[in-house]
Amino acid sequence: MTSIQERGTSAHLHSLKEGEASDRSSEMLPKQRSIIGSHVQRPPSQTTLGRSRAGSNTMNKVSGLDIARRPSENLLSNMNCSDNGNGGNMLNSFVNSALPPPKVNPAQTRRERPASNSSIGTKTTEVFSSTSASSSLGDTSDEGEGSDADKSKINTFPSILMEKATQGRGANGNGMRSASNNTIVEATTDGSKMALQKSMSFDDTAAEKTMNKSRHSYQEQFSSKKSQSSLLNSKQRSRAKSQTCSSTGYNNSSILKTFGISSKISNSSDRIEASSLEFNVPSQKPLNCKPLTPSQKYRLRKEQSEMNLRNTIKRKEKFYDSQEQILELQEGDVDDSLIWNVPMASLSTNSFLASAKPDDMNNLAGKNDLSEYTGGLVNDNSEISYTKQNHRYSNISFASTTSNASLLDFNEMPTSPIPGLNKVTDFQFIQDTTKSLASVYLHSSNRLSRSKLSERTKSSDFLPIELKEAQNQGMEDLILVSENKLDVVSHSRPSWLPPKDRQEKKLHERQINKSMSVASLDQLGKNKDREEKLIRDETNRQKYVLLLDRDITRNSSLQSLSKMVWDTPFSDETRSTIYSEILQSKTRFITKNYIQPFHELQELLTKMGDFPKNKEIEISQLIETSLRRKVSGLHDICPDLMLLLKIKSISSQGIVTGDELLFHHFLVSESFQNLGLNEIWNIVNLVQMTCFNDLCKEKFDAKVLERKGVVAGYLSQNEEFKDEFNTECINSTTWWNILERIDHKLFMWIMDIIVVNNSQSYKNSPINEDEFVNKDWEYYRSKKVVINYKILISFALNVLLNYHFGFTDLRSLCNVNDQRFCIPVFINDEFVDADTVNAVFIKKWAHYYKKF
């Protein structure tokens, strides 16, 4: 019965094939062969028939469209080679009539790759669906590229077989009615119908079971052991490929079973599961050696990262759950099994050990990274990324372990006995080893802590002043200042303000360095000027001596003297002599003729007995207001000042403005201390009569407020002086308020300048004593005294323009309560040179004096 059925079916299909060959177009047969067996190696008897039915032009057209062959083609080729001629004719006729080829757009010359969203779009989270598995399965054939339409054709293979089988059944029925009543052929046709229907139903059931099993195996594999698929060797991979080819054609195997050739194909469920397992396992490199698309790689990495995260969370939860009973232990209720003989470091050294980063360990880690990179270049992309990731973590752990080990000196450990050979118990061996390890750790940590503390002690010298003050107050220990804190603190910002960021710190450091460079250059210039000034002062002092020897009253000497006095004050040895000679010549004519002798007035004061109380109070109040409350009160006041003022009060001139200042500074000056009160009396009266006489005061008051004068030219330009540009604020009396605020050293220099600018050349025009016999002082003053009010006005102008702060006007200057207020500003700083400040004041004064 079986042989009759086979022969009948073969004959029926052969006749069906001949009948449809004339009705169908020439393109149908190549399309059908492209799905199942367009390139099947047929026996010689079938080759001629296939060529005559299909035509070479149609086959060339299909081959030029780059339509990939299916895995069933190779399978059917093997079966056709082993089958007889009748079986081959029957199979070829069924293939040519049952399966239509895919429709191809004739205008499309190149198969374009589909868009990423359409090629991998899915609603599930699976990396590869059954469709993608089947498509990758089809790509393992001889062709390299296949279209998505061909892959969908393979997946819908059972429905195509059902349709073509129904069409074939109808065609067979028509052929049998036109051929006469042949009972054998009808029986054969009915048998083929039943067999084909059974095969279709079996194929549908088998396909559904296979898909369910593949999904189930995929889920079980990812939930239990993810690394199962990566451990397949090359033999298992090749075996999985062969099983995949057979399992992909499971629909074909059920059809061929109908024709009695099912023994050629193995359609077991175990092999189907193996193939589905192989292709559902996500891996960076597919088995067909084709690279994945970027979207598939992304989904693969996403799935792997999610699985790693889930596994990590499970391990963490499991670890902490197992430790819950340890956390619940109360203090003092500790299990004995939890106590170990482990050496522990103190908190101070533990921080050092944790933060230590040796340079050799960094170099070692860098070399490992380089070797790892160069060694991994021979692998593919997936292996490089996986290897570099693993090596990175291994290098970090190795470097940290080696860095910690390098801090420990294991050479201190004694040689340990060998267990089993020496008579040492295990307990004794473990105890000795732990003691040795503890000693090594403690010694190494102590050595490291000492080195760290020594480094911090050295670096504490460069910390900001605020931190040093905090240490002095017990608020912070500079030895415990770490390197991280040193990075955020800076000398240019107080410690209570937020730290600077790196860019701001660099910018400020650059600006500070620039400012320091400029300041250093300025300081170098100042040092050079100071050295030059010292040399110049010493030279000028020697010149003063030479001028005195040569006659200082000469015209040339006075010119040189007037220039040098602006740079260098008189020395203590030459001051008194220069004053006397340039004001009254060597003959001392004024002292002899117009100044009352000191000893006569002193005798008169003695004869008076009790000095008038009101006069004495006035003198005391004058000393108090003019000296003690001013900058002169910072120094001791000579007791002889009271005597000199009393004598001056009973003299013919009486006490005039400025007497208390002149007597005080001359008494304090070393230039007149050794000369006695008589000489001081004569010098003070000489200066008052020549430099500050009544005529000079009158001219000062008249010229200082002159509208076209120099003072008015400066002060009228500024509206701030409009309230003090009057006779009440600027006059000869308020001029002395300025001198009350002048320091002693600068005061003597000012007197030197005023005296020199009131001198005259007695060498060229000597004093004729006979001319001034029985002449009063006014006559002599009109003939031989220089009235230089300009030097006094320029002095006041210098103060008003450059040092007018701390007081409203010259009249209110005497009422300033600050004793330390000084002109120039009193600076009590050891780094500030008072001589330099005074020299600047004198230079400005000389500048304004040249304007007159």
Curated annotation (Swiss-Prot):
Q: Which gene encodes it?
A: SBE22
Q: Which GO terms describe its cellular component?
A: Golgi apparatus
Q: Where is the composition biased (Low complexity)?
A: 124-139, 224-235
Q: For the region Disordered, give the residue spans.
A: 1-158, 206-248
Q: What does this protein do?
A: With SBE2, is involved in cell wall integrity and polarity processes like bud growth, through the transport of CHS3 and UTR2 to sites of growth.
Q: Does the keyword Cell division apply?
A: no
PTM annotation (Phosphoserine): residues: S72, S201, S459, S517, S520
Stretches of Basic and acidic residues bias are at 15-26
Is-annotated flag, keyword Kinase? Answer: no
Q: Where is the composition biased (Polar residues)?
A: 43-61, 74-96
User: Can you say what this protein is called?
Assistant: Protein SBE22
Q: Name one Pfam family in it.
A: SBE2_C
Q: Which GO terms describe its biological process?
A: fungal-type cell wall organization; protein transport
Q: What top-level branch of life does the organism fall under?
A: Eukaryota
**What InterPro entries does this protein map onto?**
Sbe2/Sbe22_C, SBE2/SBE22_M, SBE2/SBE22_N
Q: Report keywords, A-Z.
A: Cell wall biogenesis/degradation, Cytoplasm, Golgi apparatus, Phosphoprotein, Protein transport, Transport
Q: Which family does it belong to?
A: Belongs to the SBE2 family.
Provenance organism: Saccharomyces cerevisiae (strain YJM789) (Baker's yeast)
Q: What is its main location?
A: cytoplasm
The subcellular location is: Cytoplasm; Golgi apparatus
